[in-house]
Each structure stands twice: as structure tokens, then as C-alpha cells.
């Protein structure tokens, strides 16, 4: 008889290490520029290269950004922390050690709330613990000639422009269980960093990079299995696919008696699988010791209070407020808060007096489509929030129809302007005079006697035909509610 433990379903145990490039103008320990995309090796200096006689000095803006990020992740800020040297030899590391934080990070023990939308399942909220956030310097970048990878290349070059750029490494607790949860967690981290303005989170440019640690076990009470690290995922979709693949690979290995070894694997986007890269190092392999060139880091109570006061309302808080106070659906709240500029635009529209639900529909629909297709931002949109608010209030007040609004919208999106002024100038306002609509209805009924007779004979669906004719004759300007009311009365012989 099979052991009871083998009857339990497999469970994945997943944690993420998220490396966030902090958006400072200069590097973490030197004044060298952090500009992305310039000629190789144009943003290096003696400090970056670790030349004899140079001393690093902590960029105070890096400390501010790291503390703000930690606060947004509900982490406890350390009164005292320090930098350490992490020893390893690799061509993209000019000093042969990396300045990082080991046993005294800047912040520990936090959490974030993640909204998980699984396809075909109900959306659910999950709290993910965060173990720590620490500051460190980035490494350079290897460029392989003749191939995107080392394999197949003729030679490799190293670009140190990225070396010394400030990073905040955010280490989650192993609270994630699926590829979707991992992707949603990473997405929420980026969303928070963007709201704070401490990073652009551009994964294609390496501003946000994730390493995933995965193991599987039989049931939630079983000990953790052998942990495998996955690298080389440059999108949230890649994170989800890599995790899902690795879970299946490990489960299959255990079920067929193959060993699962502690190693680092790379996600191959083309082949949609993970491949072994190297054995995974432990902390002892790096021979950490306190950096003798950098003093202890202290964050004063005044600094904490000042930086906390500058924090914006964060995405999760906005989502709850939009749903609870404004009556928006979970979906609308999620879409509107995805980018801070969209959320700010929406709030300005509602503050100017427009209905929240109607405003959300226009912003997440027509406006978002225009912004995305034209590669604009909501902040740069000529159609200002108060102008959209005016248009929404015209619709909500029965002054114009949705059809008319869509007709004038392209011009407004391109040039901005007052919707009311355009409506008044072109005579596009809704016809809401009962006598005027009644006269048009009488004319229509007189022009279609056979349809009138058929309606009175029981084919009541013909009312839709008359509504269509009425709207066609009025250019969509007749008040729909009033038009239906008068049509119904007249068709019944009233």
C-alpha cells in the first residue's frame, strides 16, 4: 500500500529575488552617470573600477529611494546597517567583489498584498511576505559577438556602464505557489516602484530583473525540497511560463526517481524550457566581510518621518478605495491603478464632477487605446481631465448621446478643447423637446404604414426598426428614453 504522504498533491514553494535599479542620476558610490544606452564604457571612473587609492561614498539619494521602497513594502527600517564585500570572480565585475549588504540589510520583515487573476478562476487577494530589502551595486554587462549567448559566440566584450548602478534587491518569503502568483507579485513590485518614482521598472533595459527560487514537496506540511534558481526572464509572462515549466520538470523528476540538484538554470524563451547553467553557490562561497571603506549606515528619525510623508497613495490602497468608495468593479479598479498617471487622470476627472463608473469606462476604453497606440502618456494627453469630465457630464445629463461623444472624441484627443463648445458650435446637442420628437415620429409612422400595421398586429420587435429610423433622421441626437416613450405611445395608437 502506498505511503499516505505520496497520496498528497504536489505543492510548489516559490520565492523571488527582485533586483530594482534605482533611478538616480549618478551611481551608488560615485558621480559617474547612470544613463542607459550610451556608448560602451563611457560611464566608468576609478571608483567603479576599484583602482588603488579610490574610496566609495554612498549616494544619499540611493539611501532615500531604498528607504522609501522599503516603507512602501511595509518593511522595518534598520536604525543601523552596513555594507559588505561579496567576493566572486566574473568578467563583468571590475573589482572582483561586489559591494552589497549581508547580515545587516537596510530593511527586513515586510509584506505586500497581491491581486491574483488566474484565467478561468475567481480573482483572489494574497499577502506575500518580504524577507528583506538591501542595497548593492550592479555589475557590468557581457556582450557576446556573433550570438546573443556565450554559446555560439566568437568572442565576448564587457561594458562597464552598468557597473556601480544602484540596486535595491527585494527578497520575498517562499509564500508563492504558482507561476501566476509569481508573475503577479513581480508586477506589483514594479507597480509600487513606479508609483514611488524610484525606478522606471523597464524589464527590457534591465531596470527590473527577477530570479526565481523553486522547490516542490508533497503537501503543505512536508519539508522543502531541493531549491533550484531560475534566471533570464525579461517579462512577467516569461516568469509565469518559466515557473510553471520548472514545477512540472521537478515533479516529473521526483516521480521517475531522477535527482533534483541545487543549481542555477536559465529560461530559454525560444525553446520554452529551463536549462542548467551552473551549480548554485551558498553564502559561504562568497566570503562576505564588512567593507572597510564604507562606514555604518544610519537613518535618523527625522529622515524617516520626512520620507514617509512624501510617499504617495499606493496601488493596493487605491484599488480598495475605488471599489469601496467609488463603487467600481474589481476589474476597473485594477486597470485604472496599473499606471499612476492613469489613476491620477481618473481622479482628476472624478474630482471635476464626473460619474466614476462612466469616467472609468471612457478612460480604460477609448482613451487607453489612444494613449497606447500613439505611445503617449496620460500626462501628455492634450485632452485634459477637466475636459473629459465635462464630456462625461454632458452624457450623464442627457445633453449628448454616447454616439455623439464618440464622434467628437478623436478631435478632442488630438487637440483638446471644450466638448460643450464643440457641441454648441455644431448643433450636436440632444433633442429633448417632446414636441419636436413627436413631429418626427408622426412623419416616420406616416412613411411606414405597413410596418405600423404589422406592429399593431403583434410584431412588437418592429419598435427597434422605428427607433433606428428616428436616430438616423436626427443624426443620433434624439433623447433615446424620450424617443422610445413617444414611439411606444404612438405605435399603440396613442
From Swiss-Prot:
Allows the formation of correctly charged Asn-tRNA(Asn) or Gln-tRNA(Gln) through the transamidation of misacylated Asp-tRNA(Asn) or Glu-tRNA(Gln) in organisms which lack either or both of asparaginyl-tRNA or glutaminyl-tRNA synthetases. The reaction takes place in the presence of glutamine and ATP through an activated phospho-Asp-tRNA(Asn) or phospho-Glu-tRNA(Gln). GO terms for molecular function: asparaginyl-tRNA synthase (glutamine-hydrolyzing) activity; ATP binding; glutaminyl-tRNA synthase (glutamine-hydrolyzing) activity. GO terms for biological process: glutaminyl-tRNAGln biosynthesis via transamidation; translation. It is an enzyme of class 6 (ligase). The keyword ATP-binding applies. This is Aspartyl/glutamyl-tRNA(Asn/Gln) amidotransferase subunit B. It catalyses: L-glutamyl-tRNA(Gln) + L-glutamine + ATP + H2O = L-glutaminyl-tRNA(Gln) + L-glutamate + ADP + phosphate + H(+); L-aspartyl-tRNA(Asn) + L-glutamine + ATP + H2O = L-asparaginyl-tRNA(Asn) + L-glutamate + ADP + phosphate + 2 H(+). Keywords: ATP-binding, Ligase, Nucleotide-binding, Protein biosynthesis. The lineage of its organism: Bacteria, Bacillati, Cyanobacteriota, Cyanophyceae, Synechococcales. Its EC number is 6.3.5.-. InterPro entries: Asn/Gln-tRNA_amidoTrfase_suB/E (IPR017959), Asn/Gln-tRNA_Trfase_suB/E_cat (IPR006075), Asn/Gln_amidotransferase (IPR018027), Asn/Gln_tRNA_amidoTrase-B-like (IPR003789), GatB (IPR004413), GatB_C_1 (IPR042114), GatB_Yqey_C_2 (IPR023168), Gln-tRNA_amidoTrfase_suB_CS (IPR017958). Belongs to the GatB/GatE family. GatB subfamily. PROSITE patterns: GATB. It comes from the Bacteria. Coiled coil: none annotated. Heterotrimer of A, B and C subunits.
